[in-house]
A protein has these predicted regions:
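C-terminal soluble interaction/assembly domains
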Residues: 87-188
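A small/polar active-site loop signature that marks catalytic segments
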Residues: 1-126
Length: 188
Protein backbone atom coordinates (compact mmCIF):
# COMPACT_ATOMS: atom_id res chain seq x y z
CA UNK A 1 0.00 0.00 0.00
CA UNK A 2 2.87 2.37 0.83
CA UNK A 3 4.47 1.80 -2.57
CA UNK A 4 1.17 2.39 -4.36
CA UNK A 5 0.59 5.59 -2.35
CA UNK A 6 4.07 6.83 -3.27
CA UNK A 7 3.43 6.18 -6.98
CA UNK A 8 0.17 8.12 -6.76
CA UNK A 9 1.87 11.02 -4.96
CA UNK A 10 4.63 11.10 -7.59
CA UNK A 11 1.88 11.56 -10.17
CA UNK A 12 0.28 14.45 -8.32
CA UNK A 13 -2.49 12.54 -6.55
CA UNK A 14 -3.04 13.57 -2.95
CA UNK A 15 -2.97 10.56 -0.63
CA UNK A 16 -4.06 10.59 2.98
CA UNK A 17 -2.76 8.37 5.75
CA UNK A 18 -2.20 4.79 4.60
CA UNK A 19 -3.18 2.11 7.09
CA UNK A 20 -4.45 -1.43 7.22
CA UNK A 21 -8.12 -2.00 7.67
CA UNK A 22 -11.18 -3.87 6.55
CA UNK A 23 -13.40 -2.52 3.82
CA UNK A 24 -16.98 -1.98 4.93
CA UNK A 25 -19.56 -4.48 3.69
CA UNK A 26 -21.09 -1.70 1.60
CA UNK A 27 -17.84 -1.11 -0.34
CA UNK A 28 -18.00 -1.73 -4.09
CA UNK A 29 -15.34 -3.82 -5.77
CA UNK A 30 -13.59 -1.65 -8.34
CA UNK A 31 -11.36 -4.28 -9.87
CA UNK A 32 -9.95 -7.69 -9.20
CA UNK A 33 -6.83 -9.40 -10.45
CA UNK A 34 -6.23 -13.12 -10.17
CA UNK A 35 -2.91 -14.68 -10.93
CA UNK A 36 -2.37 -18.09 -12.43
CA UNK A 37 -2.41 -20.98 -9.99
CA UNK A 38 0.92 -22.39 -8.84
CA UNK A 39 0.25 -25.49 -10.96
CA UNK A 40 -0.31 -23.29 -14.02
CA UNK A 41 2.88 -21.36 -13.27
CA UNK A 42 4.86 -24.61 -12.98
CA UNK A 43 3.49 -25.79 -16.31
CA UNK A 44 4.34 -22.49 -18.04
CA UNK A 45 7.80 -22.48 -16.47
CA UNK A 46 8.58 -25.90 -17.90
CA UNK A 47 6.90 -25.55 -21.30
CA UNK A 48 8.42 -22.16 -22.08
CA UNK A 49 11.61 -22.57 -20.03
CA UNK A 50 10.71 -19.40 -18.13
CA UNK A 51 13.58 -18.79 -15.71
CA UNK A 52 11.86 -15.80 -14.08
CA UNK A 53 8.92 -17.98 -13.09
CA UNK A 54 11.32 -20.72 -11.95
CA UNK A 55 13.14 -18.31 -9.67
CA UNK A 56 9.90 -16.87 -8.29
CA UNK A 57 8.60 -20.36 -7.53
CA UNK A 58 11.90 -21.20 -5.86
CA UNK A 59 11.52 -18.17 -3.59
CA UNK A 60 7.94 -19.21 -2.86
CA UNK A 61 8.98 -22.76 -1.91
CA UNK A 62 11.84 -21.38 0.20
CA UNK A 63 9.44 -19.11 2.07
CA UNK A 64 6.89 -21.89 2.58
CA UNK A 65 9.30 -24.61 3.76
CA UNK A 66 12.14 -22.69 5.38
CA UNK A 67 10.75 -19.19 5.93
CA UNK A 68 13.58 -18.04 3.65
CA UNK A 69 12.61 -16.53 0.32
CA UNK A 70 16.18 -15.75 -0.74
CA UNK A 71 17.98 -17.37 -3.68
CA UNK A 72 19.73 -19.68 -1.20
CA UNK A 73 16.45 -20.47 0.58
CA UNK A 74 14.78 -21.43 -2.68
CA UNK A 75 17.72 -23.62 -3.66
CA UNK A 76 17.82 -25.35 -0.24
CA UNK A 77 14.05 -25.90 -0.27
CA UNK A 78 14.20 -27.38 -3.77
CA UNK A 79 16.87 -29.85 -2.63
CA UNK A 80 14.75 -30.66 0.42
CA UNK A 81 11.66 -31.40 -1.72
CA UNK A 82 13.70 -33.75 -3.92
CA UNK A 83 15.21 -35.47 -0.88
CA UNK A 84 11.78 -35.98 0.68
CA UNK A 85 10.65 -37.57 -2.60
CA UNK A 86 13.47 -40.11 -2.33
CA UNK A 87 15.70 -38.51 -4.98
CA UNK A 88 19.40 -38.78 -4.15
CA UNK A 89 20.82 -35.26 -3.93
CA UNK A 90 24.51 -35.92 -3.32
CA UNK A 91 25.26 -34.91 -6.95
CA UNK A 92 23.17 -31.76 -6.64
CA UNK A 93 24.49 -28.28 -5.83
CA UNK A 94 21.92 -25.52 -6.27
CA UNK A 95 22.52 -21.82 -5.82
CA UNK A 96 19.29 -20.62 -7.43
CA UNK A 97 16.02 -22.09 -8.66
CA UNK A 98 16.24 -20.84 -12.24
CA UNK A 99 19.24 -22.93 -13.22
CA UNK A 100 21.13 -19.85 -14.39
CA UNK A 101 23.82 -19.77 -11.70
CA UNK A 102 27.14 -20.97 -13.12
CA UNK A 103 27.74 -22.64 -9.75
CA UNK A 104 24.74 -24.98 -10.06
CA UNK A 105 25.67 -28.62 -10.54
CA UNK A 106 23.35 -31.53 -11.27
CA UNK A 107 24.22 -34.93 -12.66
CA UNK A 108 22.33 -36.54 -15.54
CA UNK A 109 21.50 -39.39 -13.13
CA UNK A 110 19.79 -36.99 -10.71
CA UNK A 111 17.73 -35.48 -13.54
CA UNK A 112 16.82 -38.99 -14.71
CA UNK A 113 15.76 -39.94 -11.17
CA UNK A 114 13.47 -36.89 -11.03
CA UNK A 115 11.97 -37.80 -14.41
CA UNK A 116 11.44 -41.43 -13.36
CA UNK A 117 9.52 -40.14 -10.36
CA UNK A 118 7.57 -37.72 -12.58
CA UNK A 119 6.69 -40.55 -14.98
CA UNK A 120 5.57 -42.98 -12.28
CA UNK A 121 4.16 -40.99 -9.34
CA UNK A 122 0.85 -39.10 -9.37
CA UNK A 123 2.18 -36.35 -7.08
CA UNK A 124 4.09 -34.78 -9.99
CA UNK A 125 1.18 -34.40 -12.44
CA UNK A 126 1.85 -30.69 -13.03
CA UNK A 127 5.48 -31.41 -13.86
CA UNK A 128 4.58 -34.12 -16.35
CA UNK A 129 1.97 -31.90 -17.99
CA UNK A 130 4.38 -28.97 -18.11
CA UNK A 131 7.03 -30.69 -20.17
CA UNK A 132 7.05 -29.33 -23.72
CA UNK A 133 5.65 -31.63 -26.41
CA UNK A 134 8.01 -32.29 -29.32
CA UNK A 135 7.00 -30.42 -32.45
CA UNK A 136 3.94 -28.97 -30.72
CA UNK A 137 4.48 -26.76 -27.66
CA UNK A 138 6.95 -24.48 -25.96
CA UNK A 139 10.67 -24.85 -26.46
CA UNK A 140 10.13 -28.03 -28.48
CA UNK A 141 7.58 -26.53 -30.91
CA UNK A 142 10.21 -26.19 -33.66
CA UNK A 143 11.99 -29.46 -32.95
CA UNK A 144 11.28 -32.97 -34.18
CA UNK A 145 9.95 -31.48 -37.41
CA UNK A 146 12.23 -33.12 -40.00
CA UNK A 147 11.50 -36.42 -41.71
CA UNK A 148 14.20 -38.13 -39.63
CA UNK A 149 12.93 -36.78 -36.30
CA UNK A 150 9.18 -36.63 -36.97
CA UNK A 151 8.45 -39.98 -35.24
CA UNK A 152 9.12 -38.12 -31.97
CA UNK A 153 6.60 -35.38 -32.78
CA UNK A 154 3.81 -35.39 -30.21
CA UNK A 155 5.42 -38.33 -28.41
CA UNK A 156 8.47 -36.87 -26.66
CA UNK A 157 7.82 -34.63 -23.65
CA UNK A 158 10.93 -32.84 -22.48
CA UNK A 159 12.62 -29.83 -20.92
CA UNK A 160 15.37 -27.98 -22.72
CA UNK A 161 18.30 -26.35 -20.99
CA UNK A 162 20.74 -23.96 -22.58
CA UNK A 163 23.58 -21.95 -21.08
CA UNK A 164 26.76 -20.66 -22.65
CA UNK A 165 28.65 -23.78 -23.68
CA UNK A 166 26.01 -26.21 -22.39
CA UNK A 167 22.92 -27.68 -24.03
CA UNK A 168 20.60 -30.22 -22.46
CA UNK A 169 17.44 -32.12 -23.22
CA UNK A 170 15.76 -34.34 -20.66
CA UNK A 171 12.37 -35.91 -20.81
CA UNK A 172 9.98 -38.80 -21.11
CA UNK A 173 8.78 -40.87 -24.04
CA UNK A 174 6.26 -43.70 -23.88
CA UNK A 175 7.20 -46.84 -25.81
CA UNK A 176 4.91 -49.10 -27.86
CA UNK A 177 4.08 -51.11 -24.72
CA UNK A 178 3.00 -47.89 -22.92
CA UNK A 179 6.04 -47.93 -20.64
CA UNK A 180 7.55 -44.55 -19.83
CA UNK A 181 11.22 -44.22 -20.76
CA UNK A 182 13.30 -41.32 -19.48
CA UNK A 183 16.36 -39.74 -21.04
CA UNK A 184 18.85 -37.06 -20.11
CA UNK A 185 21.40 -35.64 -22.55
CA UNK A 186 23.80 -32.90 -21.46
CA UNK A 187 26.53 -31.65 -23.77
CA UNK A 188 29.21 -29.09 -23.04
Amino acid sequence: AQVFAKILENRGVSVGRVSRGRAPDSAKELAMVESATVAEMVQRMLTESDTDVAESLGHLVGKELLNDSSFAGGARATSQVLSRAGIATQDLALFDASGLSPRNRVSPATIADVLIDVATERRWTELAQGLAVAGVTGTLANRFTTKATSPGRGVVRAKTGTLTGVAALAGIVVDADKRPLVFTVIGN
